[in-house]
């Protein structure tokens, strides 16, 4: 097993290009290790990931190339011959939900919460929805995006976003690693390839997601909200 922690402490687990590159590097290393069957994504307790780095987004008015790179990372999760698993102990929002949706298995503690707050900023979870719909079904993913309401762990488990609720995640991880160790990596890859053919996330899906993200990020109302947050720490619902 190879473990990577996504929470960067002071930045509360925001997703930026550096994190995306680091996750790609960890995948490269895990895939190169013939003994490794599991890439485990973890965080510091309290916050798993808050999604897009909004301060960085405020400084980047042009096309969001990072959106395409993030989409490619999620798609790689669904194709690698590794079992990609995540342990959640706390809050997950925005792109963090996308990371989970693209994982093969998600373990979460009872106190965890899961939300898509993008609409509050005038945005949409463009890169997240294709993977979340595949995992939870259309209506649950759509409702999460529309209402922006956080789900508790029990709700997330009921809709398939969480695979196991664990008071003791370490014990659940040991069980997972034990069982994954019995699988041939080629078989995991075959399963992902076949499942991907049954529910395809294509290059056209990627293009649609990135183009829509670029369109929304260029809207004046969105730029104003991001700028206000970056400059004054003011959220849209506080204005």
Where do the model's predicted regions map?
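Key positions in alpha-helical "signaling/recognition" and NTPase switch elements
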Residues: 99-100, 156, 229
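Alpha-helical segments flanking ligand/cofactor-binding loops in enzyme cores
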Residues: 75, 97-98, 130, 142, ...
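Glycine- (often His-adjacent) and acidic-residue-rich active-site loop
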Residues: 21, 43-76
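Conserved CoA-thioester-binding segment of acyl-CoA-metabolizing enzymes
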Residues: 1-44, 178
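C-terminal long alpha-helix characteristic of the crotonase
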Residues: 107-112, 162-208, 237-239
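Hydrophobic, secondary-structure "cap" segments at the distal end of domains
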Residues: 129-139
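Glycine-rich beta-to-alpha active-site loop
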Residues: 75-121, 150
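Well-ordered beta-strand positions
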Residues: 90, 104-105, 143, 147-149, ...
């Amino acid at each position: 097993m190879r473990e990577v922690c996504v929470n960067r402490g002071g930045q509360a687990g925001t997703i930026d290009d550096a994190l995306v590159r680091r996750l790609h590097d960890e995948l490269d290393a895990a895939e190169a290790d013939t003994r490794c069957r599991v890439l485990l994504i973890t965080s510091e307790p309290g916050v798993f990931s808050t999604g897009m780095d909004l301060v960085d987004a405020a400084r980047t008015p042009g096309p969001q190339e990072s959106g395409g790179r993030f989409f490619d990372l999620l798609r790689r999760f669904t194709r690698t011959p590794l079992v990609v698993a995540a342990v959640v102990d706390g809050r997950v929002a925005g792109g963090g939900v996308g990371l989970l949706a693209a994982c093969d298995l998600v373990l979460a503690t009872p106190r965890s919460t899961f939300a898509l707050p993008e609409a509050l900023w005038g945005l949409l979870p463009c890169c997240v929805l294709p993977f979340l719909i595949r995992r939870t079904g259309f209506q649950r993913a759509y409702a999460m995006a529309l209402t922006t309401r956080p789900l508790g762990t029990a709700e997330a488990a009921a809709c398939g976003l969480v695979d196991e609720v664990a008071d003791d995640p370490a014990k659940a991880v040991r069980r997972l690693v034990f069982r994954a160790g019995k699988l041939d990596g080629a078989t995991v890859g075959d399963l992902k390839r076949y499942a991907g053919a049954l529910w395809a996330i294509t290059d056209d899906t990627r293009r649609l997601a990135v183009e829509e993200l670029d369109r929304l990020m260029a809207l004046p109302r969105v730029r104003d909200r991001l700028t206000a947050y970056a400059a004054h720490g003011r959220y849209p619902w506080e204005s």
